[in-house]
Amino acid sequence: GDRIDYFKNSVAATLAHRAFCINLAYEFPAFGPDVWGITASDSERGYLAWGGPPRDPDIEGTIVPSAAGGSLMFTPELATKALETMHEKYGAKIYGKYGFVDAFNPKTGWVDTDVIGINAGIILLSAENMRTQNIWRWFMQNREIPLALQRVGLVKYNPSVRRPNAQDQSKRHHHELRSAGLR
């Protein structure tokens, strides 16, 4: 069958996630092109594993910085802009000793007081990987990883295999977003 480029798939997923969040701005004005991110996190009502699409009924305006921050290596400009804008708009309310808070809700003023390592960690790892690519390089130096990838059928990209060009992928991506009701 067709091979999947998981990097490009991650870029497309990040773009779809951002578009989904932008479309939430009609209900939650704090969301927009430069402030976006929904993923499992704390909320005023406790821990929630929200996401989308489709529109999860638990979405109530909480923004999770690690959702954008975890995509720094896939969409560096968009994810960096999101983190910078969150920091500029909300400052010390959402950024402290360990970096960004886990989650915050601009609509209600709620800010999580917990520091959740997996969410703080993904921002740190993604930033370092975006900057140096060391994280991926070190990961692949672990001898078990290439063997595991081979055993599950993941192979390196072969440029001699015909792949859709960027225009084809862009058209397909926009079609998928329209089909999902995001455009």
Q: Where in the sequence are the language-model features?
A:
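Ser/Thr/Asn(+Pro)-rich, low-complexity disordered segments
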Residues: 1-183
